């Protein structure tokens, strides 16, 4: 039906007759001529309809926005005075020779010329995707996927599919369950990742695997999470952690170079402990120059329990965050920051303004200055490298609360005050994570997943001191987002059982849930390691947006609902009966 895309017309085609299919973006009547801006996925071109072409002119008179049309015409150069440098096709226009209305359109429930509500955009997503901004994002996503396949194919990786109907495994979030009609009372789980299957593929001898795969997690959502998401899943045998990082870093660097013409450079490597100490986050945004600075040693003997208490507590921390130019902050703004850190458990936010460094104590403004000697204040200023016009904010609490509160405040202030370089790219690797952490109930949990290998420890050493163990894990971080994470895997049954034991999984549970894995580990399992990237998050960064819904064709809301199809919905009672399922809905307390 078409010979060219609208957005591909240029001066090299002048004089040629082309056939286009697309939509009416806009129609204008000017000086007896009708001008149509015709749009398809590749762009917009201006069409001119001359009244001398009576039949074509009559059809053009009927056109309205979003009519689907087919048009044949001659490409001609625009007069120099009418060249539109804002359009890719701005040097040419199309003189219409024939025009057909394929399908008419009702008035759209969306207005493409103004901002529509998120709810309306999701309800009519098929229309929202017609907008060039959205279309460009989906096309860039396709290019990213294509690049990944080409790169990994070239490097000897095999694209192998793994099951979607599988068994629930503990990976940190709730599973989406699928009832079995044949095995009544039993359920499949949709995979949170292909983790165990890709490890089994390594045991099968496929030493380089990849898959661009849908994964599912029933968890609380936010801007960069969806219940179903796409993962670039990678696993290798006989490669070290350093080699896995090298090949995947190369992939991301070449992707950015091809799609954005940006050279990310070599990725620095930072231990987890350093990231938490300096930035209060295991995914630090290095575009922001501010750092958390420890000052507990200076405050152990001050007559101010807010500082001296945590300073003398082995599990406590007192840290300072110097904000350049922050002395200009109003009391209202400081109060807003105080309320913000309270979200993370902080009980307050002490501050010290350096109004004039040369004026000594006269140039200092702080409600806590009376508790501190001049020597201590000068030592804090020197350590934080504060200058005239800066403000120093303090976090004093448990190490966890201080890191989370000041780490989050660092990001917030960096963005709001223009300190973060939003136009830069700052990648890094974070390595040497703790092997285990405590969950909200105080139970031991794997920081990554229970199949991650410890760093240079035997099973006996791991069991003797699990809280000090580091894992052979690594995360790729870009502009404050974790875009990929992986590890060297456990490749012998003894170590895997030791990890399960530490996690409180009984031998009986181990056999029930992971018997197939423990058995497989006994048959000459090769050392293996891998990594998975969140494709949605990568594309979000490539597109310069802050919400992964912007780069998914048909996303869910933060309530995990599809407004377009009204999913999820109630099931047919007959289908539930066939599955031997009875639905018991919780009733709200009327009291």
Curated annotation (Swiss-Prot):
GO process terms (BP): aspartyl-tRNA aminoacylation
Residues holding ATP: 217-219, 226, 482, 534-537
Main location: cytoplasm
InterPro entries named among the record's database cross-references: Aa-tRNA-synt_II, aa-tRNA-synth_II, aa-tRNA-synth_II/BPL/LPL, Asp-tRNA-ligase_1, Asp-tRNA-ligase_1_N, Asp/Asn-tRNA-synth_IIb, AspRS_core, GAD-like_sf
Recorded catalytic activity of this chain's protein: tRNA(Asp) + L-aspartate + ATP = L-aspartyl-tRNA(Asp) + AMP + diphosphate
GO molecular function per UniProt: aspartate-tRNA ligase activity; ATP binding; nucleic acid binding
Pfam families assigned to the protein according to its UniProt record, in alphabetical order: GAD, tRNA-synt_2, tRNA_anti-codon
Residues involved in L-aspartate binding: 171, 217, 448, 489
EC annotation from Swiss-Prot or TrEMBL: 6.1.1.12
Keyword Cytoplasm listed: yes
PROSITE patterns registered for this protein in UniProt: AA_TRNA_LIGASE_II (PS50862)
Keywords annotated in UniProt: Aminoacyl-tRNA synthetase, ATP-binding, Cytoplasm, Ligase, Nucleotide-binding, Protein biosynthesis
Superkingdom: Bacteria
Region (Aspartate): 195-198
Cellular component annotations (GO), alphabetically ordered: cytoplasm
NCBIfam families found in the cross-reference section: aspS_bact (TIGR00459), PRK00476.1 (NF001750)
Role played: Catalyzes the attachment of L-aspartate to tRNA(Asp) in a two-step reaction: L-aspartate is first activated by ATP to form Asp-AMP and then transferred to the acceptor end of tRNA(Asp).
Subunit structure: Homodimer.
Record-given protein name: Aspartate--tRNA ligase
Species: Vibrio cholerae serotype O1 (strain ATCC 39315 / El Tor Inaba N16961)
Gene encoding the protein: aspS
């Amino acid at each position: 039906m078409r010979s060219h895309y609208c957005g591909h017309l240029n001066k090299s085609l002048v004089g040629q007759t082309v056939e286009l299919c697309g939509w009416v973006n806009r129609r204008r009547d000017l000086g007896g001529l009708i001008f149509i801006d015709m749009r398809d996925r590749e762009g917009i071109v201006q069409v001119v309809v001359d009244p001398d072409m009576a039949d074509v002119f009559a059809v053009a008179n009927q056109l309205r926005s979003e009519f689907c049309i087919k048009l044949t015409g001659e490409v001609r150069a625009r007069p120099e005075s009418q060249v539109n440098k804002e359009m890719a096709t701005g040097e040419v226009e199309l003189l219409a020779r024939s025009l057909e209305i394929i399908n008419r359109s009702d008035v759209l429930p969306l207005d493409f010329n103004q901002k529509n509500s998120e709810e309306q955009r999701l309800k009519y997503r098929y229309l929202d995707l017609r907008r060039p901004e959205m279309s460009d994002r989906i096309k860039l996503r396709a290019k990213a996927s294509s690049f990944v396949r080409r790169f990994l194919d070239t490097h000897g990786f095999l694209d192998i599919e793994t099951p979607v109907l599988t068994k629930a495994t503990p990976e940190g979030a709730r599973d989406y369950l699928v009832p079995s009609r044949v095995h009544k009372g039993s359920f499949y789980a949709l995979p949170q990742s292909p983790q165990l299957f890709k490890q089994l593929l390594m045991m099968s001898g496929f030493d380089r695997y990849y898959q661009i795969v849908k994964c599912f997690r029933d968890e609380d959502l936010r801007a960069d999470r969806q219940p179903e998401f796409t993962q670039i899943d990678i696993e290798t045998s006989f490669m070290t952690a350093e080699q896995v990082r090298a090949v995947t870093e190369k992939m991301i660097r070449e992707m950015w170079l091809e799609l954005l013409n940006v050279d990310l450079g070599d990725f620095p490597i930072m231990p987890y402990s350093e990231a938490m100490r300096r930035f209060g986050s295991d995914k630090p945004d290095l575009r922001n120059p501010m750092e958390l600075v420890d000052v507990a040693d200076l405050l152990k003997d001050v007559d101010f329990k807010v500082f001296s208490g945590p300073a003398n507590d082995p599990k406590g921390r007192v840290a300072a965050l110097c904000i350049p130019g922050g002395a200009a902050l109003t009391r209202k703004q400081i109060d807003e920051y105080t309320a913000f850190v309270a979200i993370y458990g902080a009980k307050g936010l002490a501050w010290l303004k350096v109004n004039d460094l040369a004026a000594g104590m006269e140039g200092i403004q702080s409600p806590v200055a009376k508790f501190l000697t001049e020597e201590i204040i000068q030592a804090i200023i020197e350590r934080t490298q504060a200058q005239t016009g800066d403000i120093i904010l303090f976090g004093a609490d448990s190490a966890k609360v201080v890191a989370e509160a000041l780490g989050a405040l660092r990001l917030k202030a960096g963005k709001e005050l223009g300190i973060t370089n939003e136009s830069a790219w700052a990648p890094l690797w974070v390595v040497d994570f703790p092997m285990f952490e405590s969950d909200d109930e105080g139970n031991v949990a794997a920081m990554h997943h229970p199949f991650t290998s410890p760093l240079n420890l035997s099973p006996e050493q791991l069991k003797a001191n699990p809280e000090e163990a580091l894992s052979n894990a690594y995360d790729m971080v870009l502009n404050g987002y974790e875009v990929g994470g992986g590890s060297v895997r456990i490749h012998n049954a003894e170590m895997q059982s030791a990890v399960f034991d530490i996690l409180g999984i009984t031998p009986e549970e181990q056999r029930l849930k992971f018997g197939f894995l423990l058995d497989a580990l006994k048959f000459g399992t090769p050392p293996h390691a891998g990594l998975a990237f969140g494709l949605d998050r990568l594309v979000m960064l490539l597109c310069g947006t802050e919400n992964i819904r912007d780069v998914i064709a048909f996303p869910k809301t933060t309530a995990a609902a599809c407004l377009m199809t009204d999913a999820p919905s109630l099931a047919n009672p007959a289908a539930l009966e066939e599955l031997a399922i009875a639905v018991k809905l919780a009733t709200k307390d009327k009291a």
